[in-house]
UniProtKB/Swiss-Prot annotation:
Family: Belongs to the HIV-1 VPR protein family.
Any one GO biological process: symbiont entry into host cell
Subunit-level organization: Homooligomer, may form homodimer. Interacts with p6-gag region of the Pr55 Gag precursor protein through a (Leu-X-X)4 motif near the C-terminus of the P6gag protein. Interacts with host UNG. May interact with host RAD23A/HHR23A. Interacts with host VPRBP/DCAF1, leading to hijack the CUL4A-RBX1-DDB1-DCAF1/VPRBP complex, mediating ubiquitination of host proteins such as TERT and ZGPAT and arrest of the cell cycle in G2 phase.
Listed name of the protein: Protein Vpr
Gene Ontology CC, one term: host cell
Pfam family, one: VPR
Gene assigned in the entry: vpr
Further remark: HIV-1 lineages are divided in three main groups, M (for Major), O (for Outlier), and N (for New, or Non-M, Non-O). The vast majority of strains found worldwide belong to the group M. Group O seems to be endemic to and largely confined to Cameroon and neighboring countries in West Central Africa, where these viruses represent a small minority of HIV-1 strains. The group N is represented by a limited number of isolates from Cameroonian persons. The group M is further subdivided in 9 clades or subtypes (A to D, F to H, J and K).
Superkingdom of this protein's organism: Viruses
Principal subcellular localisation of the protein: virion
Modified sites of kind Phosphoserine: 79, 94, 96
Paired cysteines (S-S): none
Signal peptide: none
Length: 96
């Protein structure tokens, strides 16, 4: 009869510690890119919707990830990641 292999991988930290660390990092990054009043409003909305639960933590993580992804994708002035078009000179030539 087959047996499942024993877990021989590296020891992982518990889910709740990992989740709170991820939230901390996302919040510190979000503060660099969005007005604090927006983030406060988002936090209030999450708290009113989910209360003080893990579902609320997971929801705010998901929303912050989406906001930051879109922010970088559109083109953040603080980052080299993005889709900002290069400005062309008036005669239409581009430098290559």
């Amino acid at each position: 009869m087959e047996q499942a292999p024993e877990d021989q991988g590296p020891q992982r930290e518990p889910y709740n510690e990992w989740t709170l660390e991820l939230l901390r990092k996302l919040k510190s990054e979000a503060v660099r890119h969005f007005p604090r009043i927006w983030l406060h409003g988002l936090g209030q909305h999450i708290y009113e919707t989910y209360g003080d639960t893990w579902a609320g933590v997971e929801a705010i993580i998901r929303i912050l990830q989406q906001l930051l992804f879109i922010h970088f994708r559109i083109g953040c002035r603080h980052s080299r990641i993005g889709i900002i078009q290069q400005r062309r000179s008036r005669n239409g030539s581009s430098r290559s």
